[in-house]
């Protein structure tokens, strides 16, 4: 499921849609209260924030071959990426509910991510399906993410989506090799 440069925002929106469909209105009234938002966003009034905090090349991914296009053209293979997300409660929100409700929301969010572990099923093979994985980060690793943002630690869920295949726009033309024929007897 290769896609052009919008693939990163497409994946973010797909995760957002998944959370909105499965958490609203049962635990959070309005779908708009679950938002793609950086924790540094001062005035945003959302309850649950989805924040993309890192993008890395997926090195273990089986590198694909050049892709044959029409005519004498080949396209360079896609770059496989891993996207890293934090899903967190926005403590600055006016809508902020009590601690018990926050924990119920986070519990439901984990359940949703587990139950929809395959975000995109490309139908080809397991390796190309973008999957959600909960990250086993230590408390120290989590606090580092927040201290970099200069924000007090927030309770959250950390997960990755991978592989996300970012297609190349680089195309190469090749000459078809024509078999050279010559008569051996003429080579004296």
Across the structure, where does each feature detected by a protein language model lie?
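Short, cationic low-complexity segments
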Residues: 74-78, 111, 175-188
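Acidic-leaning, charged glycine-interspersed low-complexity segments
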Residues: 110-166
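Small/polar-rich, solvent-exposed N-terminal microdomains that initiate assembly or binding
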Residues: 2-66, 126
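A generic structural motif
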Residues: 3, 89-98, 165
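Active-site-adjacent structural patch at catalytic or cofactor/ligand-binding sites
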Residues: 53-92
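"Short basic amphipathic alpha-helical interaction patches in structured regions
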Residues: 64-69, 97-107, 124-126
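Oligomerization/assembly interface segments of phage tail-like spikes and tubes
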Residues: 77-92, 107-108, 153-163
